[in-house]
Amino acid sequence: VRNLVEFILRSGDLDNSSGGFGERDAMQAGTRVHQQIQKKRGADYRAEVPLVHEKEYEHFILRVEGRADGMYEDGTTTVIEEIKGTYRDLETMEEPVPVHLAQAKCYAYIYGLQNRKEEMGVLMTYTLLSSEEEGLLRPLTKEEVKPENSNWRIRHFLQTYKLPELEQWFDELLDAWFIWAEFQYQWQKARDASMQHLEFPFPYRKGQRELVSGVYRTILRKKELFVQAPTGIGKTMSTVFPAIRAIGEGCGDRLFYLTAKTITRTVAEEAVSILKEKGLQFKAITLTAKEKMCILDEPECDPIHCPRAKGHFDRINA
């Protein structure tokens, strides 16, 4: 669910400076506050509720699954709770983050559909995180975690949706995803077809045919292969070519070629380019260190210092 809504709905700026804390620190703090809130919700509260929904298309089946942070009954209405930890000022927060709300709405729709509900409640709960460097904040009280209460430590947003409203919203979300998924399907179909009759682009050198066969068989058998060979035998093409052919046979979807030096990276790029000239349809990217790629003197991935960070997610989702 999270991957789906982030892929379709994520917008705004790229900002790695938010809060100034490390990702690992935030995850640990987030786990603590999740558990605090869940334990204080009462005996009827269900935590970490697994939900699964499948929709069949012509060429594939979409399986949407995830875990709702919590669920409880409020009178005749079932409420799905999504808990998010944050370092931002909660007192100035006027509404939930759209991507966070979308995640909870997906859970609400799936549960409502499967349990024939007429309406569903969605409770977004934001709570202030503390870093290990700051020291832990005192535990939240039972009174503070009540949905009707909000303060500088915790903020709640409760909304109720009719199931037809959720259904229309969810269908539009999947329709947006389908455009990309169908494109991916057709691309992979064309890619795999181009690999079926791909031939080794050069006459084989001594030992090269054995290396190509060894790499290919190793991938098919899901084993590991360690090779020591002299310079000039053509190791790069002899490993890239059979790996790509194996992808065409359904043995994988991506190929990672790791290098320690720029020159070996360049040789790998040239190998893929040569195969493309022979008819291969294949997308290849080179991952380069941020420090080498950045247009700034010092990498600062935030909308204030970097024009490329400003509106980054608006552009990639356009």
Ranges and model annotations:
Residues 164-197:
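Charged, low-complexity
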Residues 103-106, 169, 242, 267-275:
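Alpha-helical scaffold elements adjacent to nucleotide-binding pockets in ATP/GTP-utilizing enzyme cores
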